[in-house]
């Protein structure tokens, strides 16, 4: 067990699988008490099992992050029960593929509710607790889709993740005086359940061919930077969005991807 997050309490949304699960496991391995917050209890139970089997500390809370009253209640409950709240990782996300012509407001509302509005809800709920104890960390799993690149059919998702960048910059400025840092990771093609649709449509080998690293990323390769940003080592880093994509966004054209 590591000590980089020893004594810290962290709520990680969407931690039932994929990047969220890997982040929860990594945080617990560094000494944090992890609140596994997930909408699907069975997924969260598996994350909890893996953490406890490795000797880590974690509790499971089933919550729909799109339910803002429930989200606020979760933050207040954990702060009261644990006596502190050091880290929020908003990893939960909503997805949807529709062209601009096909787009409907129900899809827009669903994606923005989880991907953007929940950032505000979590920050508003956590701020009094973090301010009282003298600081904290607020982290978001964003995406390269929107802030850096896009693709057909990703309009709602890309726009929501671009909005996350605006949130990160503004929140970093507003919360810096309270010793609360605000940062995001922008993953590229990471081998998670969320990538299943693209893998089925194009094939993993074809996707990997256009990535300079020639492979998909692993969830653990997002969890590592998350641990760093949550640690004391990153105390002077705020307002940053760090791309982790194996260089996928860099070629001028797929022709130059190698």
Write out the residue ranges for each language-model feature.
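The beta1-alpha1 cofactor-binding region of Rossmann-like NAD(H)/NADP(H)-dependent oxidoreductases
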Residues: 41, 63-73, 105, 220-221
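C-terminal helical subdomain
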Residues: 177, 184, 205-237, 244-246
